[in-house]
């Protein structure tokens, strides 16, 4: 009888088995919601799958409750320790069943309603303590998976970024941020997706100065790409227009830390334009050269554009450049532009060629000397400023290529506008300036020829200029020079046709 009393009845054993099975089922099913995270292993105790997996919000050790009854054989065989083993197992199972998962505790503490104030909540500290106590294998992963369940990637980025600025939460937030990036890498999230999650699509030309940009670059370095620079450029191009990219790269080249990358991306951009067959006008506008006005030749972007056009249009790049410039600027602005470009050695050659194309276009269009004078806005200047204008030489070049006797044409037009006396003084003053000296000397000769052909003597000129009563240098200069001219011209005029002149000037009758 004593032996019978120590042996458990079959009914008791079966009841115990049923209780444990129920406990195990309840414990296993205690958390049913899933959180999608990337298939990476944290501390080597998370099972890895090929691409994605779904983790429950509880950590691994809280879920893996298997039916294992080492006491059952002893109970059946009649050992004396079955009762103690049974009690211990029941206690363990009951404790595990009552233990809440990190996600359950998160919700119990109503942390799911704190939004972006999560890290500043006192309840959050309690929850962290609970997770670290009951998730001994990988508490950080348990924390991250719970937060990932309740927050979108964008919201979590903002949450962790804010927490990193607070000393008390900086370390944890940094760890969780690392887990988030590692999760993206193993989940093979696209660079475009991560770029947008980090709100870099809204940074514009300041993208390179954002701390998030360096994080994104770090992500790109971990991602599998055969051409990292092209991959970076394509993502930037997905969210930003060409002109914004130009500003972005230009700004980034000013900082030493981003200069190399920005220069490489700028090169990729030009290569991409060339491969895509972008027009000179598109690139011109993207480089903001349509806003440079007359100082365009001094812009670093202009030299890049001319290089692009030369490579894209090898047959006649100068015409392509002029056509584009003419699309955005008027004739008078172009003339100023070319005149300014001719003053600098590095751009003198190109500016001269483009000016030649402009003058040829005017000639083909039948533009007159007077029309060109007005196009260059020379008609708006007082006589005292005419030869100071950088356009006077441009106008002279045009008249020279379109008329057989350009100096006479120019003098006639200027005389009608300013009068003989004023024009003579304007020309005399211009001979003292190196830039206009040659033109002024030629115009002086043409004016003197006109006077001579009209029969004006030096005395007539002195009377016209009131030399006796006028002691200014210009008046005396005009009187003296015409007197010399008249004497030589008279000698040449009176010399027989078959005798060559010596040190004189032949004047057509």
UniProtKB/Swiss-Prot annotation:
Record's keyword terms, sorted: Host cell membrane, Host membrane, Membrane, Secreted, Signal, Virulence
Pfam families given in the database record: PexRD54_WY (PF22748)
Reported induction: Expression is induced during host plant infection.
CC per GO annotation: extracellular region; host cell plasma membrane; membrane
Protein location: Secreted; Host cell membrane
Disulfide bond annotation, renumbered to this chain: none
Chief location category: secreted
Protein family membership: Belongs to the RxLR effector family.
Record's function text: Effector that enhances P.infestans colonization of Nicotiana benthamiana leaves.
UniProt free text on domains: The RxLR-dEER motif acts to carry the protein into the host cell cytoplasm through binding to cell surface phosphatidylinositol-3-phosphate.
Protein name: RxLR effector protein PITG_16195
Annotated organism of origin: Phytophthora infestans (strain T30-4) (Potato late blight agent)
């Amino acid at each position: 009888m004593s032996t019978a009393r120590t042996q458990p009845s079959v009914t008791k054993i079966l009841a115990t088995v049923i209780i444990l099975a129920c406990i195990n089922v309840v414990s296993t099913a205690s958390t049913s919601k899933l959180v999608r995270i990337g298939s990476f292993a944290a501390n080597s105790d998370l099972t890895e799958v090929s691409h994605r997996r779904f983790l429950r919000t509880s950590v691994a050790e809280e879920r893996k409750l298997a039916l294992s009854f080492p006491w059952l054989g002893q109970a059946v065989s009649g050992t004396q320790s079955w009762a103690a083993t049974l009690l211990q197992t029941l206690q363990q199972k009951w404790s595990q069943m009552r233990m809440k998962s990190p996600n359950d505790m998160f919700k119990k503490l109503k942390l799911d309603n704190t939004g972006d104030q999560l890290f500043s909540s006192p309840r959050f500290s309690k929850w962290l303590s609970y997770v670290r106590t009951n998730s001994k294998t990988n508490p950080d992963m348990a924390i991250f998976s719970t937060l990932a369940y309740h927050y979108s990637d964008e919201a979590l980025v903002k949450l962790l970024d804010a927490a990193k600025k607070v000393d008390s939460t900086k370390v944890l937030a940094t760890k969780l941020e690392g887990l988030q990036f590692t999760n993206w890498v193993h989940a093979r999230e696209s660079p475009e997706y991560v770029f947008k999650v980090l709100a870099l699509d809204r940074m514009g030309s300041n993208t390179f100065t954002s701390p998030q940009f360096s994080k994104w670059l770090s992500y790109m370095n971990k991602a599998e790409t055969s051409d990292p620079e092209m991959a970076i450029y394509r993502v930037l191009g997905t969210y930003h227009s060409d002109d914004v990219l130009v500003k972005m790269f230009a700004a980034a080249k000013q900082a030493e830390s981003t200069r190399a990358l920005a220069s490489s991306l700028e090169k990729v951009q030009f290569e991409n334009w060339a491969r895509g067959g972008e027009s000179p006008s598109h690139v011109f506008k993207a480089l903001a050269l349509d806003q440079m006005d007359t100082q365009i030749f001094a812009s670093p972007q202009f030299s890049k554009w001319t290089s692009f056009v030369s490579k894209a249009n090898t047959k006649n790049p100068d015409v392509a450049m002029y056509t584009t410039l003419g699309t955005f600027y008027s004739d008078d602005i172009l003339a100023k532009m070319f005149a300014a470009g001719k003053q600098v050695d590095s751009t003198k050659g190109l500016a001269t060629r483009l000016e030649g194309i402009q003058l040829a276009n005017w000639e083909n269009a039948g533009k007159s000397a007077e029309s060109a004078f007005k196009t260059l806005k020379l008609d708006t200047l007082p006589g005292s400023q005419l030869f100071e204008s950088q356009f006077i030489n441009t106008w002279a070049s045009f008249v020279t290529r379109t008329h057989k006797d350009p100096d006479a044409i120019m003098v006639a037009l200027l005389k009608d506008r300013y009068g003989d006396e004023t024009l003579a003084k304007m020309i005399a003053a211009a001979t003292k300036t190196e830039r206009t000296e040659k033109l002024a000397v030629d115009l002086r000769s043409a004016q003197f020829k006109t006077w001579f052909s009209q029969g004006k003597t030096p005395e007539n000129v002195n009377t016209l200029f009131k030399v006796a009563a006028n002691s200014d240098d210009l008046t005396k200069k005009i009187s003296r020079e015409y007197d010399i001219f008249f004497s030589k011209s008279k000698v040449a005029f009176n010399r027989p046709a078959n005798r060559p002149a010596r040190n004189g000037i032949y004047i057509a009758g």
